């Protein structure tokens, strides 16, 4: 079964994200468990946690169908120790929130070297940061998102993801989320069925489908290999729709959250139906 949804707003309380996912016909969703542009957040109240869990139960969402995302401020590969420690502390807090909500995945952007250290050192810091977090918080899987490679962001090559995973001590606590826009912008061609075969075979050989815990389904406004991260609607932009048909028709993408982060929330319900129609072709 395909779990399809979108990154919905948690404004007014995380429990509202469940209702917004239902409104657009999703059987999956992503959310921020706190303001993604602030370091600090109030702790989750017992009442909020209870409501979130109850709403999930009522609307039949399991932890496998929900992909929380961490704060954009966090940089687990920061070259400076003090800033890296601040990021690790914030990441641990995010993991604890996810665990409190009864969820088990935390999606994050790996980190940036800020042109101050080598890529290899940055990847080692990211892995070290993950190791600290998963030793501190039980149950939650750290889900590394591939990036477009904009600026000094790491994670734009499959080899980066594999190198991080290799250095994580408990492999059951680490996974990957592939973003289609980021793949294309980073230079992985997914614009045809044949191109998808090559790219996803490479992914399986270098990283492995066993680590795939979610996907972000996005169109792109920029060209193949642009290294610029600009999302578009599914049926617009430079990628085309072959990749979405490929994903919907291959079992390797079953039972993981397939999350829209496309730029027009008002057509998410339509885009979800479009994906479901592709799986029936």
From Swiss-Prot:
Q: Which residues bind Zn(2+) 1?
A: 69, 109, 145
User: What keywords is this UniProt entry annotated with?
Assistant: DNA damage, DNA repair, Endonuclease, Hydrolase, Metal-binding, Nuclease, Zinc
Q: Where does Zn(2+) 3 bind?
A: 182, 229, 231
Give any single GO term for biological process: base-excision repair
UniProt: Zn(2+) 2 binding residues:
145, 179, 216, 261
**EC class (word):** hydrolase
| GO MF term (any one) | DNA-(apurinic or apyrimidinic site) endonuclease activity
Among InterPro entries, the record links this protein to:
AP_endonuc_2, AP_endonuc_F2_Zn_BS, Xyl_isomerase-like_sf, Xyl_isomerase-like_TIM-brl
Show the catalytic activity.
Answer: Endonucleolytic cleavage to 5'-phosphooligonucleotide end-products
**Which note does the record give on the cofactor?**
Binds 3 Zn(2+) ions.
So which cofactors does this thing need? Zn(2+)
Q: Which SUPFAM superfamilies match?
A: Xylose isomerase-like
Q: What is its EC number?
A: 3.1.21.2
Query: What's this protein's family per the entry?
Result: Belongs to the AP endonuclease 2 family.
Q: Which function does this protein serve?
A: Endonuclease IV plays a role in DNA repair. It cleaves phosphodiester bonds at apurinic or apyrimidinic (AP) sites, generating a 3'-hydroxyl group and a 5'-terminal sugar phosphate.
PANTHER family hit by this protein: APURINIC-APYRIMIDINIC ENDONUCLEASE, ENDONUCLEASE IV ENDODEOXYRIBONUCLEASE IV
Name of the protein in its database record: Probable endonuclease 4
Q: Which organism is it from?
A: Haemophilus ducreyi (strain 35000HP / ATCC 700724)
Q: Which gene encodes it?
A: nfo
